[in-house]
Amino acid sequence: MKAQEIREKSVEALQQQLLELLREQFNLRMQKATGQLSQTHLLKQVRRDIARVKTVLNEKAGD
């Protein structure tokens, strides 16, 4: 997910996106713990997407 795409979304959409990403991160962690996760790069990708969304939310809160 690109930072520019995130910045174009509304605050409500960003909060919904953050919730979905946190759920996805939880599911990936559970898959890793049980040995079912074959694409481990997804953990890093989701973690960074969460950080991007949180950053943009903080930027919008400052405006």
Swiss-Prot record:
One GO BP: translation
Nucleotidyltransferase in keyword set: no
Record InterPro entries: Ribosomal_protein_uL29 (IPR050063), Ribosomal_uL29 (IPR001854), Ribosomal_uL29_CS (IPR018254), Ribosomal_uL29_sf (IPR036049)
MF-aspect GO terms: structural constituent of ribosome
PROSITE patterns (UniProt xref): RIBOSOMAL_L29 (PS00579)
HAMAP family: Ribosomal_uL29 (MF_00374)
Family classification: Belongs to the universal ribosomal protein uL29 family.
Identification of the protein by name: Large ribosomal subunit protein uL29
Species of the source: Chromohalobacter salexigens (strain ATCC BAA-138 / DSM 3043 / CIP 106854 / NCIMB 13768 / 1H11)
Upper classification of the organism: Bacteria, Pseudomonadati, Pseudomonadota, Gammaproteobacteria, Oceanospirillales
Gene encoding the protein: rpmC
